[in-house]
């Protein structure tokens, strides 16, 4: 089965504030865009992915990600991340009612297509399933099988919240690139150690952070 991914991205000017100790105000928007571009490019290259819908109200991000082949869905209603994801899932399903839908974080710059395919193939076995992040507190992917609502519960302690909602936690090994989201400088260094995509490698080079880059 191939999946449609829904990728949320907030306005670039407000993105990645927790990277303030690593990247200044003038660099963070470009870094957030680079993360999203590398995430979307890798997702579109995965054999398990049919297409990618990016949920954003940022015109620059929308233009750049559409150029990669993503569909852009307006960031609405104005009710936060989970409302936007639920809306986007409904938009996707309006045209493909039998599609499996998965929400994927936009800050996975080390994402590898084959590892994403493994996660999505495992998710096929369950009505709803999720993958915890590298910190084992949050969530990087939430999948809903055809005919099932996504019911996103992203935010603080989303791992516990998704588990409480009835979604099955995927305990896969060897999928570090799908779990390594980037919120802090330490996260970015961990992603660089895995090997990030070309756009993140170029943006991170301006930060003078040591570590392997662009090898994936």
Curated annotation (Swiss-Prot):
Gene3D superfamilies: Spore Coat Polysaccharide Biosynthesis Protein SpsA, Chain A. GO terms for biological process: F420-0 metabolic process. Phosphoenolpyruvate binds at residues 139, 155, 158. It is an enzyme of class 2 (transferase). Transmembrane segments: none annotated. Its EC number is 2.7.7.105. Keywords: GTP-binding, Nucleotide-binding, Nucleotidyltransferase, Transferase. Pfam families: NTP_transf_3. SUPFAM superfamilies: Nucleotide-diphospho-sugar transferases (SSF53448). It catalyses: phosphoenolpyruvate + GTP + H(+) = enolpyruvoyl-2-diphospho-5'-guanosine + diphosphate. Pathway: Cofactor biosynthesis; coenzyme F420 biosynthesis. One of its GO terms (molecular function) is GTP binding. Signal peptide: none annotated. Guanylyltransferase that catalyzes the activation of phosphoenolpyruvate (PEP) as enolpyruvoyl-2-diphospho-5'-guanosine, via the condensation of PEP with GTP. It is involved in the biosynthesis of coenzyme F420, a hydride carrier cofactor. Belongs to the CofC family. This is Phosphoenolpyruvate guanylyltransferase. The lineage of its organism: Bacteria, Bacillati, Actinomycetota, Actinomycetes, Kitasatosporales. The gene is fbiD.
């Amino acid at each position: 089965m191939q999946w449609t991914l829904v990728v949320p991205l907030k306005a670039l000017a407000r993105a990645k504030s927790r990277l303030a100790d690593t990247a200044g105000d003038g660099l963070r928007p470009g870094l957030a865009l680079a993360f999203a571009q590398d995430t979307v490019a890798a997702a579109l290259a995965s054999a398990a992915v049919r297409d990618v819908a990016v949920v954003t109200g940022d015109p620059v991000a929308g233009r750049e990600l559409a150029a990669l082949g993503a569909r852009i869905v307006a960031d609405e209603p104005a009710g936060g991340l989970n409302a936007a994801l639920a809306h986007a899932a409904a938009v996707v399903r309006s045209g493909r009612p039998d599609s499996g839908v998965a929400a994927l974080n936009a800050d996975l710059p080390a994402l590898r297509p084959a590892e994403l395919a493994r996660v999505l193939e495992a998710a096929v076995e369950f009505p709803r399933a999720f993958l915890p992040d590298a910190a084992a507190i949050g969530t990087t992917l939430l999948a809903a099988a055809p005919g099932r609502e996504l019911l996103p519960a992203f935010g603080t302690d989303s791992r516990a919240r998704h588990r409480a909602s009835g979604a099955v936690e995927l305990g896969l090994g060897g999928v570090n690139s799908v779990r390594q989201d980037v919120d802090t400088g330490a996260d970015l260094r961990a992603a660089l150690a895995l090997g990030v995509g070309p756009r993140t490698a170029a943006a991170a080079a301006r930060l003078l952070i040591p570590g392997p880059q662009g090898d994936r």
